[in-house]
Amino acid sequence: QGLSCQLMKMTHDHLRESGYYGAVLVPAGVGLFSMYEKLGYRGFCPMERRSVLPGVPAAIEQLDVEQYAALRRQYLPENGVLQEGAMLDFLAGYNRLYSGQNCLLAAAQEEDTLYIQEFLGDAEALPGVVAALGAKSAKVRLPGGSKPFAMYLGFTEDRQEPSYFGIALD
């Protein structure tokens, strides 16, 4: 086996010994899905990229990391992967964090385009958020479609596959 596979197996052993019940990852490319499948991972959480145009501006509020984390726990679907601590600090280092009516998002704006790294809530709110932030368009990844976004490897039989994994810094 290759060095990468050996390192992954060592990582899995360490995670099991540390009490984790599974591992989640986002392959860097489509071709890597098959490699991770050979290690026992299964694709889950289908997502699709969408473009959004502005609508009528909505009321939004900028948040700090702690506020975002608290609201994220409320917006996550049941059995969603809880990503906190260093991950949210890293996310906030490259994005601004916002809440709006029925939504929560992490986004960065480059020129006239808003790049939304995570969106939780009612997708109907997106056009208003795009307008409120002064963007001419947005790129966002939302649940749906047929292609899995992430992969999961369970270490125990008594846990079900996560329902949502949304933060990826691509």
List where the protein language model places each region.
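Conserved acetyl-CoA-binding loop-helix of GNAT-fold acetyltransferases
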Residues: 1-17, 38, 123-133
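Conserved GNAT acetyl-CoA-binding A-motif
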Residues: 8, 13-28, 135-145
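Active-site/acyl-donor-binding loops of N-acyltransferases
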Residues: 37-57, 117-170
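Short alpha-helical
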Residues: 30-31, 124
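Ordered hydrophobic segments in well-structured contexts
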Residues: 22-24, 95-98, 103-108, 115-118, ...
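Basic (Lys/Arg-enriched) interaction patch that binds polyanionic ligands
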Residues: 26, 32-38
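Amide-forming acyltransferase catalytic core, primarily the GNAT-like/NAT-type
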Residues: 39-120, 124
